Amino acid sequence: MMMTTGNLYSQNSALRQKAERKLEAYFYSYKPKNGVLSQPARMKKLAIDDKRHVVDITMDGNFAQQEFTKSSVEKIYRKVRRVLPNPFDDYLIRIYTNGSLVEELISGATAKGGNALWGDIDYNDEPWVENVSRPSRPTHGLYDRHLTLWASHGRYYDNKKGFWKWQRPNLFCTNEDLFMQTIVVPFLIPMLEHAGAYVFSPRERDWQTEEIIVDNDGSSHNSIYQEIEGKNEWVKAPVKGFGWRNGSLQMDENPFERGTVRMNLTQKKVKDLAQTVYRPNFHKAGRYAVYVSYATVEGSVPDAEYIVYHKGQETRFHVNQQMGGGTWVYLGTFDFDRGCDGYNQVVVTNRSQSKGLITTDAVRFGGGMGNIERGGTVSGLPRCLEGARYYAQWAGVPYKYYSTKNGTDDYGDDINVRSLMSNWLGGGSVYMPLIKGKRVPIELSLAVHSDAGYAPNGTDIIGSLAICTTDFNDGRLNSGISRQASKDFAAALLNGIMRDLPAKYKNWNRRYLWDRNYSET
């Protein structure tokens, strides 16, 4: 029997076209077992290598919007093999989506060589902040874990229209900018803190509209700053620090570059201790968040002592000054009385079990009102209602992080600064060793949104959606581990919600597990 080369080529071409049609039809009608895809999956590319007997199928990002399991992946390959015409059904088949083989996206999958996704990367030193007045020290749960958590959007300045506005529409007498704060701040953050975690928020968390600054370079509200010498006196540190002034901040002003920092040698004996007293003058009694600041220098210690006196009660903290210098560091929220006395103050000592240096800078009481001027005006609202872009500037974040749009687009800047601020804090830690930063071991960032939408039938947007990003930076986090860890967490979070909420609310939709490139992820 004779067959010309042209006939062979024609036959092979027809088989390839048949394979492509069948695969396109299969994937277009594909529905995952758990959940749904927001749009039908589409095949972007089909490559068949007859010499190596390999079929490579590249899917679009919609196909990644599902939780892959061992059984679901096996089923996909089995179905694809049945769809392919002979001889392609005997070839090695590889299916890709978002730059990875689908079998590599199985939740809980291990990296090559049998190592778990996390490997041996872990932080085991002193936490950034620890309340040492607690009757017991946790050893499990989330102790020594540092998380970044924020609630949706916030008030921002519309550069094109020239006024401040909410990012999301009004709905049921509120909007997402306001509503999500009422879930994240009083419930979610405390739950994680009670489990042992230290939680950082790139948005102001304190709803208190009053704000009092006490600092060696000048204080607000006629508050009192006092240094008490011990064996050694407090001296000026060789770095810039916070400097307070009444009024608003302009575009690129950094309040942590216009003041000074004080420092002292550490001591162990009580008789040798020095103190710095921060005594605010409260115009009204109430609950105020307490933020401290300091500088991280050579010789900084992991257990700087801070004592918060609130209505005569005493709560002691250890702050790891080997990380996180040059910004506001949250200690807690306390009840304070009206006035200015020793029953309501913060005291920093130079007590430490380590030989080295204690530094101290400004202490802030209360969330306050927004003070970042844009377009000649401030928002006129409490800082906690503003977007993260404005808090970042008040917290000493460099201009390049909170103004990626060079001052022309506050909306875009607000979205970008949340993750960039987390990277700025976490750079140099075990989780972000390749970037420069404050060395805070942040191992998770999570944004919580209500999705702020509406639909004609009122049902399509009800339910839960999780978003992660795996196809970025060659599929790796800065620590070198696979970004699949993010998808594993997103899937676990979504599964937990779908386990818990239906128990209370009966019908609850699992919307999507999106693997997309969002700035926040």
Describe each PLM feature range.
Residues 9-52, 125-126:
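N-proximal, solvent-exposed amphipathic alpha-helical segments enriched in charged/polar residues
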Residues 64-92:
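Short, non-transmembrane amphipathic alpha-helical segments
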Residues 150, 387-483, 513-521:
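Active-site microenvironments of hydrolase-like enzyme catalytic domains
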Residues 256-282:
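Short beta-strands within extracellular/lumenal beta-sheet-rich domains
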Residues 274-298:
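A short beta-strand element within beta-rich, extracytoplasmic domains
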Residues 296-315:
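Short, surface-exposed beta-strand/strand-loop-strand elements in extracellular ectodomains
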Residues 311-341:
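Extracellular carbohydrate recognition and processing domains
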Residues 346-357:
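Short beta-strand-plus-loop segments that form exposed binding edges in beta-rich domains
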